[in-house]
Regions:
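Stable alpha-helical elements in mature extracytoplasmic
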Residues: 31, 35-39, 124-128, 167-170, ...
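Extracytoplasmic
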Residues: 48-50, 68-70, 76-79, 94-96, ...
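Mid-domain, small-residue-enriched loop/turn segments at the edges of structured enzyme/sensor domains
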Residues: 108-115, 119-175, 179, 194-197, ...
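Second-shell loop/turn segments in exported
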Residues: 21-30, 67-75, 111-121, 183-193, ...
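Active-site SXXK
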Residues: 61, 75-93, 142, 174, ...
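Short, well-structured active-site flanking segments
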Residues: 90-105, 210-215
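A small/polar active-site loop signature that marks catalytic segments
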Residues: 179-244
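Beta-lactamase-like hydrolase cores
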Residues: 4-72, 131-138
Length: 244
């Protein structure tokens, strides 16, 4: 048996010391002239088509750069920043939307009371089905009440074909994953009847043979409920993605 010292081997590899890792940026004085020059350069990009904007110093309120700032332009999805700001000022960041289900006038029917949660999930429907099964012996029909929203399903100027294109969904107060069909994220085709789809999905879980639109009767018995994520989470997702 040979001793380990008799074994031949290559040269030992030396590991170089790592470079200094990146450090978080720290506040400092900004070169406003250089910033303006860089923004001017970027704004000349022909791919931007018609472009306008302004940059404000948040400490002084002074405008440090602008390009056609007083020109009216189509705002696209940026207007949702104002909607988000208004919501966070008017509502508590922990505010949740509660979707409730009530027993129908027929004791074997249930009615979903849509409340505005357009990001409902399969897990929420599973939860509702489990709660309903404990409170209702047999479910023959599942209906949904959308009376909380009385406005139009399409905003003025919207192209209905954009629903099939996956860019928008009809404005209804209950949706599963924003009305997406066949996926939970992305620009996939959207449903033309997203609230009814919620009722259909819940009906499938309960083995109900009837699904449709309905209304919650006065003094109806609540049989199930689920909560949306808090407003802070919903607002973050709203401004992060161009999801209309």
């Amino acid at each position: 048996q040979r001793e380990y010292g008799d074994l031949s081997h290559g040269e030992a590899q030396a590991v170089e010391a790592p470079e200094e890792p990146l450090r978080a940026a720290e506040p400092g004085e900004a070169d406003l002239d250089a910033l303006g020059a860089k923004l001017d350069e970027l704004a000349k990009n022909k791919d931007l088509a018609t472009f306008g904007g302004e940059v404000i110093d948040t400490e002084t309120g002074d405008m440090v750069w602008q390009r056609d700032a007083d020109k009216r332009l189509t705002p696209a999805s940026s207007t949702k920043v104002l909607t988000t700001a208004a919501a966070t000022l008017a509502l508590d960041e922990n505010e949740r939307i509660t979707t409730k289900v009530y027993r129908g006038s027929n004791e074997r029917n249930v009615v979903i009371k849509a409340a505005g949660d357009v990001w409902m999930t399969h897990e929420q429907l599973d939860d509702l089905a489990e709660q309903i099964s404990k409170n209702v012996e047999q479910v023959d029909g599942v209906y949904i009440d959308t009376s909380v929203w009385s406005g139009e399903a399409q905003a003025p100027g919207w192209d209905p074909e954009n629903v099939d294109g996956g860019f928008v969904a009809p404005m209804e107060p209950a949706m599963l994953y924003g009305g997406r069909l066949g996926a939970t994220t992305g620009d996939v085709p959207r449903s033309h009847e997203p609230a009814l789809d919620v009722a259909k999905q819940l009906g499938d879980r309960l083995g109900a043979g009837k699904v449709g639109m309905g209304s919650v009767a006065e003094n109806a018995q609540e049989v199930a409920s689920v909560d949306s994520p808090p407003l802070a989470d919903r607002a973050r997702e709203m401004v992060r993605h161009s999801d209309n």
